[in-house]
Amino acid sequence: MAKKSSSRLPKRKGEYTYRGKTVSELQELSLEEFAELLPSRERRSIKRGFTDGQKKVLHEFKEGKKIRTHHRDMIILPEMIGIAIEVHNGKEFVNVELQPEMIGHRFGEFAPTRSRVNHGSAGVGATRSSKFVPLK
């Protein structure tokens, strides 16, 4: 009996591509040409232009400085691939290593703002039935 390959997990063959273009091809494109490959929301955001804060982040990136930012709405561009940045999640800065799969997404998608709550067990007297549970 032959083994079935898992159809849920996509097989990775070779280099990562975004809309049919490799990372090196994407890095050679101008910003306007790259914007045409993006989904409409990101494309419109880039065509409107970057904010002053986003321009500062791009400038720091080009100088090779360590990037710590509150600009969670900044779109990840192909030229940013391979660097580590720190994105603020509302409480602290979260380390994010930019990988090719992240192209076209925003910084904030990789720094979650909410953490899962782990409630403890209820105390004695918290419910009516727990009044009759003997203490240790």
Swiss-Prot record:
Protein's gene: rps19
A Gene Ontology BP annotation from the UniProt entry: ribosomal small subunit assembly
Assigned GO CC terms: cytosolic small ribosomal subunit
InterPro entries per the UniProt record, alphabetical: Ribosomal_uS19, Ribosomal_uS19_CS, Ribosomal_uS19_euk/arc, Ribosomal_uS19_SF
Protein name (record): Small ribosomal subunit protein uS19
Family listed: Belongs to the universal ribosomal protein uS19 family.
Species in which this protein is naturally found: Methanosarcina mazei (strain ATCC BAA-159 / DSM 3647 / Goe1 / Go1 / JCM 11833 / OCM 88)
Function: Protein S19 forms a complex with S13 that binds strongly to the 16S ribosomal RNA.
UniProt entry keywords in alphabetical sequence: Ribonucleoprotein, Ribosomal protein, RNA-binding, rRNA-binding
Origin: domain of life: Archaea
Residues of the signal peptide: none
Claim: Ribonucleoprotein is one of the keywords in the record: yes
GO molecular function, one term: rRNA binding
